Amino acid sequence: MNELKKNITSMYNDEGKEWLDSLPDITAKIANEHNLSGLTPVNNMTFNYVASGYQNDKPIILKIGMNSKALTKESSCLKAFAKHATAEVIADDTNMIIMQRAVPGSTLKAHFPDNDIDATKILCESIKELHKASIPESHNFYHLSELFKTLDQKLDIPDEILSKAKHLRDKLLSTTTEEVLLHGDLHHDNILKNGDRWLVIDPKGFIGDPAFEPAAYLCNPIPELLQENQPREIIENRINICSAELDIDSRRIADWLYAKSVLCWAWSLEDNLDASYWHNLLEMIENFSPCT
């Protein structure tokens, strides 16, 4: 809950504080309307309030957010990915989603760092399943090109890093030969154990290059990855596994990682959050993606 409070107050100031204060009333109203019980806040909240509980006897997750547009998009994306390893949407509204809860619900982060090879293969299986989904004929999902327009803004990022990221972005976008519906944020905490299978949550929903999908996983978990003795070797191994399992060129995966990391740096600056992790990561992976 502390990270949620920090992020919301940093992004929304007094409006964010008011929303946080109103959460008990909002939660109680939703619980009453949808017959929810046993609601318990989860430990890893970042930008949305999330609680586990039950609807009758069915395990559920309740997600409430300030950004109704983002939640509406997430719900649409979960529905587009239906039957492709994602959580089922039970009910939704402008500021909330009630969805299937994974049981036992342990995340892929439990495999880090000791079983990172296995975790990366699980990631790849999840990606394969997700990318079987068709792009809906009518949708509100942005193309990756729209997402990366953020890099064209005036940003407090060193020129050589920003220029390289823009170069890689342009090269990758212009050489994309296949486009799929992307999860867009497929890191460890968004892949959960559900029985003997794995369930994906929290899709962002973008259209674009399949090679972009591993990027979120490659730079996570934050901050634990960079606290390891050999984080560079971990990332290199992950890239090689993803390349082999997904039949995607390793350089292309590495280039998207670099561009995505600079984008995350830009987002951190926009949201008044600490961006040091991204600076440190980019220094470490600099020669993964030579600017050619």
In which residue ranges do the predicted regions lie?
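Conserved NTP-binding catalytic cores of kinases and kinase-like/nucleotidyltransferase enzymes
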Residues: M1-T86, I285-T292
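An alpha-helical support segment within catalytic cores of ATP-dependent transferases
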Residues: E18-A31, K132-G184, N194, A244
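Short glycine-enriched loops at secondary-structure junctions
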Residues: M45, D93-I97, F206
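Active-site acidic catalytic loop and adjacent metal/ATP-binding pocket
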Residues: N48-Y54, V89, K166-F212
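A glycine-centered beta->alpha junction motif in the catalytic cores
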Residues: N67, I98-D114, K132-I135, F148-D156, ...
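Active-site Asp-x-Gly
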Residues: N194-N240, D247, D274-P290
